[in-house]
Amino acid sequence: FNGIDFNDIIDLHKSGVKAFTNSYSCKESSEMIMNSLLYLNQIDTLLITKPKDQSFSDGVVNNGYYSNTVGLKGIPRISESIAVERDLSILEYIGGKIHFSGISTKESVSIIRDAKTKKLNVTCDVPIHNLILDDSNVVSFDPNYKVDPPLRTKDDIDALIEGINDGTIDIIASHHEPQDIDTKKCEFEKANF
């Protein structure tokens, strides 16, 4: 939405756009999510959001044993679960449709599972890399393992797979974001996600 007004959203919807996102806005807030859902409810359209509380997201890897072992600044798992909880609370309050793009923690799986039990209109996806790689990979300092959301623990992988099997997670996504070679051939902390 970042600067787009509602008339533009209506025009885009009339042209065939089926969903809108705030995912790349660093200004995402409770107010932005609420206003987005209010606007999109009027045209029965989906909001896609990337669950990340920016105030906790200035690290480069999952916060935990491996980030501490190698001395890389961690992104705490609550960065994701706080955003999921917040957005679902807003969804429950005003209604609408929301899709979480890129869940990676067992807490998020549990919260979304509960929301689906309450019949909230929520879907989500998991990046394929969060299903096959865990945060132990960062000990290599290979910048290719600097991804968003960060690689999490083996317990998270187990919960994500369970979420796929029980229908909590709707989509396995690539989350492929092509990078210029120079943005990955550098120190881990300076590399792009």
For the regions a language model picked out, list residue spans one by one:
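Active-site anion/phosphate-binding pocket segments in diverse small-molecule metabolic enzymes
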Residues: S174-I181
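Gly/Ser/Thr-rich active-site loops/lids in small-molecule metabolic enzymes
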Residues: E80, E189-F193
